[in-house]
Amino acid sequence: MKLILRADVENLGRLGDVVTVKPGFGRNFLLPQGLAMLASDANLKAFELERKKLQAKMDALRTAASDLSAKIAATELVIPVRVGENDKLYGSVTTAIIGDALAEKGVDIDRRRILLDAAIRTLGTHEVRVRLHADVVATLNVKVVAEDKVSDAAEPVVEAEPETPAE
């Protein structure tokens, strides 16, 4: 089945590409989602007229994703977790937990956009990638701390200057 892509599709092609896909993938996913249209002569002509609008829309999405990427890069999440002996985590830190913590910071991102190779199972600072757009991937610093040490991690300790006795 030959289709014209109306948006960038990961592992398939970019906006305007004419691709050949299996009929089930085209009928069940690409066409209903509005990501593609059948590649006929009439649709090719119609797409050329629509291409500039779609390209402007894609550029706006890319710009918004870049702005959000800068905001995410400046954010450091502190996630408190329960730990047992030898600082071993009970459970792990997953994309859902990271997504909820980001939402609390005012950055609303679908948890499926958070890319973790494996769940985080150790204390410390971890770099987590967030795919915001096909071309934009942000890096987020996630600091996993023990629950009883949350106040230490959230607020840096500032030592007071020693007082000199007044004479």
Curated annotation (Swiss-Prot):
GO cellular component: ribonucleoprotein complex; ribosome
HAMAP family membership: Ribosomal_bL9 (MF_00503)
Presence of keyword Ribonucleoprotein: yes
Superkingdom of origin: Bacteria
Pfam families in the cross-refs: Ribosomal_L9_C, Ribosomal_L9_N
Function of the molecule: Binds to the 23S rRNA.
Keywords assigned: Ribonucleoprotein, Ribosomal protein, RNA-binding, rRNA-binding
Gene: rplI
InterPro entries tied to this protein: Ribosomal_bL9, Ribosomal_bL9/RNase_H1_N, Ribosomal_bL9_bac/chp, Ribosomal_bL9_C, Ribosomal_bL9_C_sf, Ribosomal_bL9_N, Ribosomal_bL9_N_sf
A GO MF term: structural constituent of ribosome
Record-given protein name: Large ribosomal subunit protein bL9
Family of the protein in this entry: Belongs to the bacterial ribosomal protein bL9 family.
GO biological process: translation
